[in-house]
Design a protein with these regions (language model features):
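Conserved structured core elements
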Residues: 26-27, 37, 76, 98
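N-terminal pre-domain segments of enzymes
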Residues: 1-33
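Conserved beta-strand hairpin/beta-sheet module of binuclear metal-dependent hydrolase folds
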Residues: 33-84
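Short linear motifs in intrinsically disordered/low-complexity regions
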Residues: 6, 42-43, 112
Length: 126
């Protein structure tokens, strides 16, 4: 049975990248166009880069990344966007929850001494 056959007829549509989704999901995704927003002094949030948003805060010692996304490619794309605003070195990342950690290696490649912060139970989920 194909993926298409597992859905009730008429309940899915094919999206612009060939993905199958409910029509309301495809409509909602149009609102999530990839864009870096300045959300405060030295603070940015990238929306539409993947499942999670990646946020960045520039502190006195460098850039803190909040959530690293689903993959290294996603985090690399996020860094490329924020580098248009700041060249501060990446000094830390914060995990808000476990499935937003997939792009951490991209940050470690920039800083072998990267500080990583998350809640006490996050290690069990990695």
């Amino acid at each position: 049975m194909s993926v298409e056959d597992s859905f009730k007829p008429g309940t899915t549509q094919t999206g612009p990248k060939g993905q199958l989704a409910h029509p309301k999901t495809l409509e909602h995704s149009k609102r999530l166009k990839k864009k870096l927003y300045k959300v405060g002094d030295n603070a940015w949030s990238l929306i539409g880069n993947g499942l999670s948003n990646q946020s960045f805060v520039e502190g006195p010692e460098g850039l803190i990344c909040i959530d690293t996304g689903e993959s290294n490619q996603e985090m690399a794309a996020a860094l490329k966007e924020v580098r248009k605003e700041t060249q501060a070195p990446v000094v830390a990342c914060i995990y808000t929850h476990f499935h937003y950690v997939g792009g951490t290696q991209t940050l470690v490649d920039e800083n072998k001494n990267l500080a990583i912060w998350g809640h006490n139970g996050i290690q069990a989920n990695l």
